[in-house]
A protein has these predicted regions:
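Primarily recognizes the serine-hydrolase "nucleophile elbow" in alpha/beta-hydrolase
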Residues: 170, 176-221
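A domain-start/cap signature at the N-terminus of enzymes
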Residues: 20-97, 181, 254-260
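Loop/turn elements at helix/coil->beta-strand transitions in domains of secreted/extracellular proteins
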Residues: 95-99, 130-134, 174-178, 197-203, ...
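Gly/Ser-rich "nucleophile elbow"/oxyanion-hole loop immediately N-terminal to the catalytic nucleophile
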Residues: 90-95, 146-184
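C-terminal catalytic histidine-bearing segment of alpha/beta-hydrolase fold enzymes
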Residues: 228, 232-234, 252-326
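Active-site machinery of serine-nucleophile hydrolases
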Residues: 99, 103-161
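Sec-dependent N-terminal signal peptides of Gram-positive bacterial secreted proteins and lipoproteins
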Residues: 4-23
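Conserved alpha/beta-hydrolase "acid-adjacent" motif
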Residues: 234-240
Length: 326
């Protein structure tokens, strides 16, 4: 693949880290060179070193070996999507299991199947503990969504419901308990899918992404927890736009803002649980500006990239998501 100059590649990386690809032709995107973007971002770009996160390293050691790899070829488009799949250790075909679909940020796109799992909590935490979830992690070969120009999606996004259906039909998935989650590009993809395919998910967890509310036709009917860092201008603005949209539709929601990401986790879970106990189907959590930046590796300069794991660490959030049914 032809290489650009370092400065040009850094520009492309900056776009990709926000979860997008440069688009000129509507839904059929001219994709960015993702293999270069992802490699560059992981090695020299804005991607955190999480080797000091002992909990994450324990998850990687104990949970990641339980994942296997597969692929789905879509009959409508001819496109193929590789995926990571986790089955509970005591999986039995005679039982049924909830399934969580995790979609990573733009740096997880490409051909590396390990990285989407080792980059953070989002792909592994659902396979830990007593939840007994099946976990599906699509690994798209390209960046699949554009939030810079016309807010468009590629065919990879549109085939994802069929991929989910294929996996759910192959394994013993409780179809009323399929959940979606993602960060950045994955957050936007998940929010788009939940709102345009309203029967797809029982609930979704959106972490630092955004999409125009006017392009989310069924968003008000969904069960959502939407988390963003206060200093992530685009994601925080996306929260506010969706709140305004819900208010105009007469739909109530729960919210907690100025949450200190560095506070004791039991305290954070308690505050979040108090909000969730109000019984709203849609809930917003916003970290206080600056608090997600403490303790991150020195190459991280944006709250967007620093904030992903904080939401996934909250058991109150995870338990609420898994308690929802269609």
């Amino acid at each position: 693949m032809k290489r650009t100059t370092i400065m040009s590649l850094m520009t492309v990386v900056a776009l990709a880290l926000a979860g997008c690809a440069t688009t000129k032709n509507g839904d059929q995107d001219e994709q960015a060179p993702v293999s270069d973007i992802a490699f560059f971002a992981r090695t020299t770009g804005e991607h955190p070193d999480k080797s000091a996160d002992s909990e994450l390293q324990e998850l990687i050691a104990s949970v990641k070996p339980g994942y296997t790899q597969g692929s789905y070829t879509d009959e409508e488009t001819g496109l193929t999507v590789p995926y990571n799949l986790y089955l509970p250790p005591d999986y039995e075909a005679s039982k049924s299991y909830p399934m969580v679909v995790f979609i990573g940020d733009a740096t997880t796109a490409g051909t590396d199947m390990d990285y989407p799992l080792t980059q953070g909590w989002g792909g592994l935490i659902w396979a830990s503990g007593d939840a007994e979830c099946i976990v599906l992690n699509p690994v798209y070969p390209d960046v699949v969504i554009d939030d810079h120009d016309a807010y468009t999606v590629t065919d990879y996004v549109k085939l994802t419901p069929r991929l989910i259906g294929e996996v759910a039909g192959t394994y013993s998935v409780e179809t009323d308990r399929i959940y979606g989650t993602g960060q950045s590009m994955g957050a936007m993809t998940t929010l788009y899918l939940a709102s345009n395919y309203p029967d797809l998910y029982a609930a979704v967890l959106i972490v630092d992404g955004q999409w125009p509310a006017g392009q989310l036709p069924e968003v008000a009917s969904q069960h959502i927890i939407y988390i963003a860092a206060g200093g992530d201008d685009k994601a925080a603005a996306g929260q506010e736009e969706l709140k305004q949209y819900l208010t105009e539709k007469g739909v109530g929601y729960g919210e907690i803002s100025q949450l200190d990401a560095q506070a004791d986790r039991d305290s954070l879970n308690g505050q979040v649980q108090t909000m969730l106990d109000e019984g709203n189907a849609i809930n917003f959590i916003t970290w206080a500006s600056g608090t997600v930046m403490q303790g991150v590796s020195s190459n991280i300069t944006s709250e967007h990239m620093a904030s992903f794991d904080y939401g996934y660490k909250l058991s109150a959030v995870r338990n609420w998501i898994l308690s929802q049914t269609k």
